[in-house]
A protein has these predicted regions:
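A broad, structure-centric signal for solvent-exposed, well-ordered loop/edge residues
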Residues: 25, 29, 54, 62, ...
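Residue-level preference for short coil/turn positions at secondary-structure junctions
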Residues: 1-2, 82, 126, 158
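Helix-rich "cap/lid" substructures immediately adjacent to catalytic or cofactor-binding pockets
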Residues: 2-87, 164
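Gly/Ser-rich oxyanion-binding loop with an adjacent helix/lid
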Residues: 62-132
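Alpha/beta catalytic cores of group-transfer enzymes, especially the acyltransferase/condensing modules
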Residues: 11-13, 38-41, 100-175
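Ubiquitous "structural anchor" signal
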Residues: 18-20, 96, 100, 174
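Generic anion/oxyanion-binding catalytic loop in active/binding sites
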Residues: 18, 58, 97, 130, ...
Length: 175
């Protein structure tokens, strides 16, 4: 068998019911959820039952996605799958670092909770928006951004997908 990489997702991967089957089938995954619940009560139930509108609020999204990311990796590890490499996208980078042992114990989850609260507060104080632009070259998107005072390219995800962010009304006009 070749090398195995665990790739941890970021914000935007949330959905109602995420992680429930891991909780039901894997003691290692269940331990991750229980540890999360000890620091942030209700995290597990939020993953399993919260409507997508609640899960999409940053202060909820990030702890839940992180928890499911880590639970999935622990379940794979428990099943005998060894990661030769770990990587993550945005929030998933923190889960990858935690899984790799960079953060001791439950420190990664605490960090994610503080990060999520800070990001939520910043978003409430400075409302903005983001939009993914598909099927255009980066240079084309960058040129369009220059036509707006408060729209910037922020995430160069992959060829043909660039995320822009800025003032909400200007993002709406951009789209």
């Amino acid at each position: 068998m070749g090398k195995v990489a665990f790739v941890f997702s970021g914000q935007g991967a949330q959905y109602t019911g995420m992680g429930k089957s891991l909780w039901e089938k894997s003691p290692a995954a269940r331990a991750v959820f229980e540890a999360a619940d000890s620091q942030r009560p209700g995290t597990s139930q939020q993953c399993f039952t919260a409507p997508v509108e609640e899960l999409s609020v940053t202060k909820n999204t990030q702890p839940c996605v992180y928890c499911v990311d880590l639970a999935a990796a622990r379940a794979l590890e428990e099943a005998g799958v060894k990661a030769d490499y770990v990587a993550g996208f945005s929030l998933g980078e923190v889960a990858a670092l935690s899984f790799a042992g960079v953060f001791p114990g439950e420190e990664g989850f605490g960090f994610v909770c503080r990060r999520a609260e800070a990001m939520q507060k910043a978003a409430e104080e400075n409302p903005g928006a983001m939009a993914a632009v598909l099927k255009l070259k980066n240079e084309q998107v960058e040129a369009i951004c220059q036509e707006f005072e408060q729209v910037w390219p922020v995430n160069y995800n992959c060829p043909g997908q660039l995320v822009v962010a800025g003032e909400k009304g200007q993002i709406e006009a951009f789209c």
